[in-house]
């Protein structure tokens, strides 16, 4: 046996006893014979092979084979009683730690249940060549076509003898890049003196081509860029990769490794990220609600390009809780507009919510019978003034000459016939049906919010209280709609309402167009309910089953029960078809109330022929609106007070209603008899205090009239008209 002259004394002693260990090992043909011999010993009785395996891994070497620490032992263990195993102290501990580290580093995942033969091979030496050699051989036995013949075993023993003599030349390990199934790993290469030619008969497949020189391993070719959406490579064990490098011939060259050694080979490349999808950023398209897309006005692009200095205010035409409304002229175009000033004095949270709602809703509603919002402007002030004071916001609307309340109160200027009233009311229903169809509630229908221009075109305005309606799925406030136009369900505290509330208000306006007076002008909610009950009947469970669910029903107590008498009250002043539509719009139960769309299909509306309707004769020199009407009433009242006559004082009391017609005192005195004659028969008790009591009349039913009263009665031929005026005009 050749021993390298450069080896140490310890190496020579160990290698000298190597032959004896090989001869002793050849007596056992398989690992099973070791187990059978071990079972004869008393120290291995009743221990299973797996348990013994795990127990041997944590016990000292001299206890695994019944070695004696003093150096004595059987013939099989005589070769292990070498100086390297008898020596105590630091050298022995270092060798034991080195053996445990080498076993853990080179142990394959399937070595946990290996035989004793492989364990003795691991403990036979501590040099790097033996450790690497045994690791490669064990893998070749597992994965190659290695038989159990004695010839193969003898060759393996000769190979171990030959490799032990070259321990000095195998001190350094080189990185061997190996590729298997697309996975690039790094394995420890065999020593330079390792010759694989004697092992070629052990493989069933043809021999692989010779390995490339060492320089190629040190400078591998650059890694190609990974293809997008590539399949992640499978996980490959490092020991199997080292074996596969000798058996697979069609392996591509490996990419360079950043870190050498076995520890870096277990690191897999991160999963390739897919390329970023090129999404086209599209702007959201804002359309009207519920699929009713309409074209925006052509001047919407000119918003926010002007301020208040571009307008000249002419006169104030309205005022309310929201602010003031002014008539103005655009200095650039000469067009008349209406500037609605948004009041900010009492706002603690900035811009009022009612103005925000009106702006949002009006920008979604585009109809010929709805007023058009044109722009929003602010005061032309500097930044320093803006810090000290609040800027005024103005909503710019198209200017409409009149409102309906101003036209109704100017009887000497405007007079409507039945066809003209039907034409105006049809336009009102068309605008209201459009609002409801787009999913909104107006919640403030009244005469002052209905505008009419000089061409006779009607437009709905003031959508500050409008809200989006969600099919009665949520609660809304019942403190909406002016009291005179408020439906009974809101008066009783209903908070789950729908478009029927606007239909009731529109029905009140239908009667007001013919009578020129509000139908129900109560002073409070209970008084308003009492007036409604006198004309529309008392609400009860029979005609309104959901009445008991309302909050105000338990606290509302009527003085008496009234019958419904709408047709009797209005048949003599309205067409029969119009009375039928009014009756359906003033239904107490909101579930049975007609809708705006259904009202457009009513026979009275459908019978209208626009070719036969005469155009409205509206005043061209005077704009009739609510504020102008109030000024006229105030001046007339001051003029009557200046006269100082006793009759004028009575006339003022008789016309104390804000929209009652002014009548001379003689006319009022003359009509006292007829009006008081029917006072208890009709339900106009809210005017009774304005009429002087008459002591010569009996309680109802009235007695037969005397000759004088009969003569006076004959002098007034239109008796039904006189009766109606006593109810609604006094």
Swiss-Prot record:
Residues 194-203 have a biased composition (Low complexity). The keyword Oxidoreductase does not apply. Its EC number is 2.7.11.22, 2.7.11.23. Residues 1-230, 246-283, 623-730 are annotated as: Disordered. Pfam families: Pkinase. GO terms for biological process: nematode larval development; positive regulation of transcription elongation by RNA polymerase II. Disruption phenotype: Phosphorylation of 'Ser-2' of the RNA polymerase II C-terminal domain is undetectable in primordial germ cells and reduced by 60% in embryonic somatic nuclei. RNAi treatment causes sterility. Residues 57-67, 714-730 have a biased composition (Polar residues). Keywords: ATP-binding, Kinase, Nucleotide-binding, Nucleus, Serine/threonine-protein kinase, Transferase. ATP binds at residues 317-325, 340, 398-403, 625. It catalyses: [DNA-directed RNA polymerase] + ATP = phospho-[DNA-directed RNA polymerase] + ADP + H(+); L-seryl-[protein] + ATP = O-phospho-L-seryl-[protein] + ADP + H(+); L-threonyl-[protein] + ATP = O-phospho-L-threonyl-[protein] + ADP + H(+). InterPro entries: CDK, Kinase-like_dom_sf, Prot_kinase_dom, Protein_kinase_ATP_BS, Ser/Thr_kinase_AS. Residues 204-230 have a biased composition (Pro residues). CDD domains: STKc_CDK12 (cd07864). Residues 9-21, 75-94 have a biased composition (Basic and acidic residues). GO terms for cellular component: cyclin/CDK positive transcription elongation factor complex; euchromatin; nucleus. The active site is at residue 444. SMART domains: S_TKc. Residues 313-605 form the Protein kinase domain. Residues 95-122, 151-163, 676-688 have a biased composition (Basic residues). Its main location: nucleus. One of its GO terms (molecular function) is protein serine kinase activity. Cyclin-dependent kinase which displays CTD kinase activity: hyperphosphorylates 'Ser-2' in the C-terminal heptapeptide repeat domain (CTD) of the largest RNA polymerase II subunit, thereby acting as a key regulator of transcription elongation. Required for normal reproduction. Belongs to the protein kinase superfamily. CMGC Ser/Thr protein kinase family. CDC2/CDKX subfamily. This is Cyclin-dependent kinase 12. The gene is cdk-12.
